[in-house]
Regions:
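N-terminal small/glycine-rich loop or linker at the start of catalytic domains
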Residues: 8-25, 78-91, 114, 119
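Glycine/proline-rich, positively charged
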Residues: 42, 86-183, 187
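Conserved, mostly hydrophobic/aromatic
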Residues: 6, 18, 33, 40, ...
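Aromatic-lined glycan-binding groove of carbohydrate-active enzymes
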Residues: 184-224, 260
Length: 332
């Protein structure tokens, strides 16, 4: 397993990390979740990413129980705030009160005194950015988080935060990024790098599409994410036949390189020095081990060129935000 420095922090994180949205929110049982987590440690993964909203606290609680049996300095733990945590729509967002309330609740569920990385899950344009930034800084000043990050912010929002608090405010950005979704390359990568911010990318396997498990003209496997109505909300475009046909053209490229489709997709993401870690989900331990094999793979220029030829104009390249992200900045 290779490790990379997370932005301007002193954290060294595995370039393959384990996320908990698929593992915990996808209905995977506790013992299977424990097995996936154990497999991650066996593979050298030391970076674990969750969020308060995953299962409305269930994901954090599960990892709190599982990870509490290991030395706290043996892993890097990240969580997020923003999502709606109850039936009350007001129980969400990035107000000072909500951030203060949710960090304490997250730490209780995670059974730890601090998280290594506390992230804004989305931007909240309904709250003055000054209030949000001051609240996040208070979390760090109180020792409840070591570093801060954000997910799915526009460059306008990132720049506004940096203008207020300086480039040392954030160490990480968490955008969607894969062969099929390249939106962060347009603007976010350059702004982040200029300010000491690394990328922790989610959905590097394109919601599983880049593993090759879905074929054009065929129904998705019954046990797959695409067949689960609770999990496939963001997959509509990815399941179009033209996208699946483009992904099918990657199959001989992976075969010739001696790689699985997943290894090819993860290595493609990790080719970028801006990326500190690629977050993968898992419902079975063998998936964790299989994805971890992508660490350290270097794709040749010929392979990279073949990928571009195969995908053509299929990937999203314009600066576009993922689901639920909102543009705009509010000031006091």
């Amino acid at each position: 397993m290779d490790y990379r420095r997370l932005g301007s922090s002193d954290l060294e994180v595995s370039d393959i990390s384990l996320g908990s949205w698929l593992t915990f929110a996808g209905g995977v049982g506790f013992e299977q979740t424990r097995a996936c987590t154990d497999a991650a440690f066996e593979a050298g993964i030391n970076f674990f990413d969750t969020a308060n909203v995953y299962g409305r606290g269930a994901a954090e609680s599960a990892w709190g129980e599982i990870l509490s049996g290991r030395p706290r300095d043996s892993y890097v733990l990240a969580t997020k705030v923003w999502g709606q945590m109850s039936d009350d729509p007001a129980d969400s967002g990035l107000s000072a009160a909500q951030i203060a309330k949710q960090i304490d609740a997250s730490l209780t569920r995670l059974r730890t005194d601090y998280v290594d990385l506390y992230q804004a899950h989305r931007f909240d344009p309904g709250v003055p950015i000054e209030e949000t930034i001051e609240a996040f800084q208070q979390v760090v000043d109180s020792g409840k988080a070591r570093y801060l990050g954000f997910s799915e912010w526009t460059t306008e929002q990132v720049q506004a935060a940096i203008d207020l608090a300086g480039p040392e405010l954030f160490v990480s950005s968490q955008p969607q990024y894969s062969m099929l979704w390249r939106a962060p390359e347009a603007e976010l990568f350059a702004l982040s790098t200029a300010n000491g911010i690394s990328q922790i990318v989610w959905s590097p396997l394109g919601q599983g599409v880049l593993t090759g498990k879905y074929r054009p003209g065929q129904a998705p496997p019954s046990d797959s994410r695409a067949a689960n109505s609770d999990m496939n909300v963001a997959m509509n475009r990815l399941m179009d036949d033209d996208v699946l046909e483009a992904v099918d053209r990657l199959r001989p490229i992976a075969d010739q390189a001696g790689l699985s489709m997943a290894e090819l997709a993860l290595a493609w993401v990790l080719r970028r020095p801006e990326v500190a870690s690629a977050i993968v989900g898992a419902s079975r331990p063998e998936q964790v081990h299989a994805n971890a094999k992508a660490s350290g793979i270097r794709l040749t220029p010929d392979v990279l060129a073949a990928i571009e030829d195969a995908l053509g104009d299929t990937p999203v390249t314009e600066p576009t935000l993922a689901t639920n992200a909102r543009p705009g900045v509010t000031h006091r």
